[in-house]
């Protein structure tokens, strides 16, 4: 379950992040607000500090899993596991504070909720969340590094390659999950 959940989180998270970026651009056309201003995290990713990396990859996953799957899910399970998982996933998405992150956080929250209910502990969730955030951070660091070096075409190719890899991860996750 753990490995297939990781594949599903990485794959579906990437797909829904892409959808969120598309929606940011779509709404940008109608509102006149630049798409880059709709996701405040984008500014932070351009100026990463070691503290930001540590927080994103280690501290935030622990805190978020404790709150959403450790406390909230446990309390909400009296309404049924399915309802509790969906409720916690939506709350997890909304907590991220913008449309782009909300979309993929809800999807990842559904998977993490399933794992928490299935295993009845959040230890695996913390590890999964750390792995997902670390993988995302690695993609950002590589892409930022390529752009800084003036290799925008290579950064674009890296993004396309990442997308293909993510589709393969989803397929593997579905294969092992079901």
Summary of predicted features, one role per range:
Residues 1-60, 73-77:
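Juxtamembrane helix-loop-helix connectors linking adjacent transmembrane helices
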Residues 51-178:
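Transmembrane helix-loop-helix hairpins at the membrane interface
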